[in-house]
């Protein structure tokens, strides 16, 4: 008989939709309701996806994997961590916050560098927030109040498919009962994306010229006249129009994504964008929000900041936390060949890091805590399979606006498979025995 589990939180993207219904039969998920295509794929087990149910180990990366028990795999991982000079513990964005807590404790014990995927996506946003502040609100406020929405360097139609219908553009809110008709949508993007096609105003900025465009908007806002016909490829008239719309908004929200953080200028772009929002607050209410990708990338930044005071890329090699992005971040350590052991959990750097970093990953001992086969597990010496957070085990995740949400358990994990936090607990115990 099919059982319907209601109000399930989707553990895929930073929108963390919490209205899913999952159809379960004999401890198998047979269908989903209300989920987007990506959310549906997270819950449904598709043909071709290789799920690990037992730990695997090999001495040499050219050998085949041999099945071992959890005890052996975790003990060997503990040995590698304690014997390494500078271990790197990376990932964290697709697991829950209790695992993060144990991860930070482990990093402190072994004197490791601990980093998460923010260092290759919204790291610059966090640097900008440290520089100039963070005029923020929740997605609920955006849904109920915002009548001007800006998507800057962001394409939620593909990256966060339910964001527009649930929280921003199409959502019917308390003061915005007509949904889309009550809102003006401005999209800043060099390409005509599916999101840009829906825009009332599309500012087609030239690549790497975001800083110039923000500066021009700030100048216009302060009453200066532009002396040129175009700024960053955008006609001056369109800039005047966009600024006028923002000034006359009752409540505005600027959503920005990796189109701004990973283009030329990095955190200086965000500095300027935050200053634009601060300037706009002289006229009306305006907020800004990073479009966080993985469902709990924000959660790790929160946990690490509570414990160490720094959001990502923290180096414990001297026994106390040090933070210097560019020196203590995963990519830089790997490309310079400074780390001699890597523990990867809940991420896939093998598929996304530059070639030079992946080449170094192939040379050093690599342990993966991952439920499925990925390009990173192909490079690993040890694979430890966990239960999937948000599907087979509950926990806490932080939405893109910093609201913590409780993940639901929908089905039981495969027999004998432990959650991330249990694996890390045992690992900490083994490390303490060896030190």
Swiss-Prot record:
Keywords, in A-Z order: Methanogenesis, Oxidoreductase, Selenocysteine, Tungsten
Keyword Oxidoreductase carried by entry: yes
SUPFAM superfamilies: Formate dehydrogenase/DMSO reductase, domains 1-3 (SSF53706)
Lineage top rank: taxon: Archaea
InterPro entries xrefs: Formylmethanofuran_DH_bsu, Mopterin_OxRdtase, Prok_molybdopt-oxidoreductase
GO biological process, one term: methanogenesis, from carbon dioxide
Cofactor(s) named in the record: W-bis(molybdopterin guanine dinucleotide)
Keyword Oxidoreductase: yes
Catalytic activity as recorded in UniProt: N-formylmethanofuran + 2 oxidized [2Fe-2S]-[ferredoxin] + H2O = methanofuran + 2 reduced [2Fe-2S]-[ferredoxin] + CO2 + H(+)
Pathways per UniProt: One-carbon metabolism; methanogenesis from CO(2); 5,10-methenyl-5,6,7,8-tetrahydromethanopterin from CO(2): step 1/3
EC number: 1.2.7.12
Gene Ontology MF terms in the entry: formylmethanofuran dehydrogenase activity
A Pfam family matched in the record: Molybdopterin
Function: Catalyzes the reversible oxidation of CO(2) and methanofuran (MFR) to N-formylmethanofuran (CHO-MFR). This enzyme is oxygen-labile.
Family that this chain belongs to: Belongs to the FwdB family.
Subunit details: This enzyme is composed of six subunits FwdA, FwdC, FwdD, FwdE, FwdF and FwdG.
NCBIfam families: one_C_dehyd_B
Designated name of the protein: Tungsten-containing formylmethanofuran dehydrogenase 2 subunit B
Source species: Methanocaldococcus jannaschii (strain ATCC 43067 / DSM 2661 / JAL-1 / JCM 10045 / NBRC 100440) (Methanococcus jannaschii)
Source lineage: Archaea, Methanobacteriati, Methanobacteriota, Methanomada group, Methanococci
């Amino acid at each position: 008989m099919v059982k319907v589990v209601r109000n399930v939180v989707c553990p895929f993207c930073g929108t963390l939709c919490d209205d899913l219904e999952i159809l379960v039969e004999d401890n198998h998920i047979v269908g989903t309701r209300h989920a987007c295509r990506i959310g549906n794929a997270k819950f449904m087990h598709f043909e071709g996806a290789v799920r690990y149910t037992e730990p695997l180990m090999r001495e040499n990366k050219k050998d085949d994997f041999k099945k071992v028990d959890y005890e052996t795999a975790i003990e060997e991982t503990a040995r590698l961590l304690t014997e390494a000079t500078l271990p790197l513990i990376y990932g964290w964005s697709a697991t829950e916050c209790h695992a993060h807590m144990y991860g930070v404790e482990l990093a402190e014990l072994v004197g490791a560098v601990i980093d998460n995927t923010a260092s290759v996506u919204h790291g610059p946003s966090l640097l900008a927030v440290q520089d100039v502040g963070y005029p923020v609100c929740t997605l609920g406020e955006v849904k109920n109040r915002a009548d001007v929405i800006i998507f800057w360097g962001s394409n939620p139609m593909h990256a966060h498919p339910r964001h527009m219908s649930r929280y921003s553009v199409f959502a019917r809110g308390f003061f915005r009962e007509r949904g889309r008709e009550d809102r003006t949508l401005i999209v800043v993007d060099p390409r005509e994306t599916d999101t840009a096609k829906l825009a009332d105003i599309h500012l087609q900025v030239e690549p790497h010229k975001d800083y110039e465009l923000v500066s021009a908007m700030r100048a216009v806002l302060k009453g200066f006249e532009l002396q040129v016909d175009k700024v960053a490829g955008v006609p001056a008239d369109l800039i005047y129009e966009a600024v006028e719309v923002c000034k006359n908004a009752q409540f505005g929200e600027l959503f920005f994504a990796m189109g701004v953080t990973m283009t030329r200028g990095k955190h200086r772009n965000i500095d300027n964008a935050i200053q634009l929002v601060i300037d706009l607050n002289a006229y009306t209410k305006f907020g800004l929000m990073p479009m966080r990708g993985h469902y709990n990338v924000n959660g790790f930044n929160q946990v690490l900041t509570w414990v160490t005071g720094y959001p990502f890329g923290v180096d414990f090699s001297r026994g106390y936390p040090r933070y210097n992005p560019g020196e203590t971040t995963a990519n830089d350590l790997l490309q310079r060949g400074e780390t001699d052991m890597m523990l990867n959990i809940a991420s896939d750097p093998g598929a996304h890091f530059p070639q030079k970093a992946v080449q170094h990953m192939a040379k050093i001992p690599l342990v993966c805590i991952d439920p499925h086969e990925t390009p990173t597990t192909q490079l690993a010496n040890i694979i430890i399979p966990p239960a999937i957070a948000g599907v087979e085990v509950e926990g806490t995740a932080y939405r893109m606006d910093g609201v913590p949400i409780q993940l639901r358990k929908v089905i039981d994990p495969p027999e004998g498979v432990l959650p991330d936090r249990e694996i890390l607990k045992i690992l900490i115990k083994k490390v303490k025995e060896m030190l």
